[in-house]
Regions:
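Eukaryote-biased recognition of intrinsically disordered, low-complexity regulatory segments
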Residues: 4-27
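Short strand-turn-strand beta-turns centered on an Asx-Gly dipeptide
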Residues: 12, 29, 74-76
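Short, flexible N-terminal segments of the mature chain
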Residues: 21-39
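Short, structured protein-protein interaction patches enriched in aromatics and acidic/basic residues
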Residues: 57-69
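Glycine-rich phosphate/adenylate-binding loop and adjacent beta-alpha elements
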Residues: 74-97, 101-104
């Protein structure tokens, strides 16, 4: 049976990337514990509007753990203390206790400038994909589905890599602000398949160069990214990306 909880919510307010920003505080009363975290934020916005205050801004879309837009730093943890493999929108208030102080912040990264409050611009990930996260194909008739033989193991591993939703939790958790888990997942999903091999060297070099250009840091293997990834991406992908990158550089 659901019960109601009351708590103090500290949420980040910032008018843009150059604004200093600050925390505002709001007392949330009698919130059902079967309410999702984003539904609770909806209630916050309604209460702020009714009080004549500026509403709180955060990003969201599908609310089904698919799109990766609900990127919030909750009590010092990307996506909050959810079940392993879950996003902010899959976090429920039963995870919190009556009287708690809950802190909500945006992703903190030079590569993710704040648009407003807790909404950040994750367009840097799109630019990394545009640098090489694709295969070049001729237009025309598609190949027969069974024309290229791929082992079940390779197909499964490539699909696991492809489940990355580009939410940015890996960057937010990393002390260096590295996007290596994201980049390595996108490189791996193609490197594991024969369609991705012809451009593998070019892809690894181009995507890492773009990642560095956009202000993301380097990986130092602390595995913080792996611990918070909502799709359970493995740092084995980072090892694969390093192999792809070193091989490409040696071949130059």
């Amino acid at each position: 049976m659901a019960k109601n909880i009351s708590f103090t919510l500290k949420y980040w307010k910032q008018n843009g990337p150059k604004d200093k920003g600050h925390f505002d505080t709001h007392e949330m009363k009698n919130i059902p514990d079967d309410t999702s975290f984003l539904e609770m934020l909806d209630i916050l916005i309604e209460e702020l509007i009714e009080a004549g205050e500026e509403p709180f801004v955060f990003d969201h879309d599908c609310r089904e753990g698919i799109c990766g837009m609900c990127s919030l730093y909750i009590n010092g943890v990307p996506h909050g203390k959810t079940e392993r493999g879950a996003t902010t929108c899959q976090l429920y208030m039963r995870r919190f206790n009556d009287g708690d102080v809950i802190t909500v912040e945006p992703w903190r990264s030079a590569g993710f400038p704040v648009i407003k409050d807790c909404m950040v611009d994750r367009g840097a990930f799109d630019k990394i994909i545009q640098a090489g996260g694709y295969t070049s194909v001729r237009t025309g008739q598609a190949q027969d589905a069974n024309a290229i033989l791929i082992s079940k193991e390779a197909a499964d591993e490539a699909m696991d890599c492809a489940t990355c939703i580009g939410c940015g939790a890996c960057v937010a958790a990393c002390k260096n602000g590295s996007a290596m888990l994201f980049v390595s997942s996108k490189v791996s999903q193609l490197a594991l398949l024969p369609q991705g091999r012809p451009e593998a060297a070019k892809r690894a070099k181009a995507m890492i160069a773009k990642m560095d250009e956009l202000g993301f840091g380097n990986c130092t293997n602390t595995r913080a990214c792996e611990a918070v990834c909502p799709k359970n991406e493995s740092i084995a992908n980072i090892a694969r990306l390093n192999r792809e990158f070193i091989s490409a550089k040696l071949a130059d």
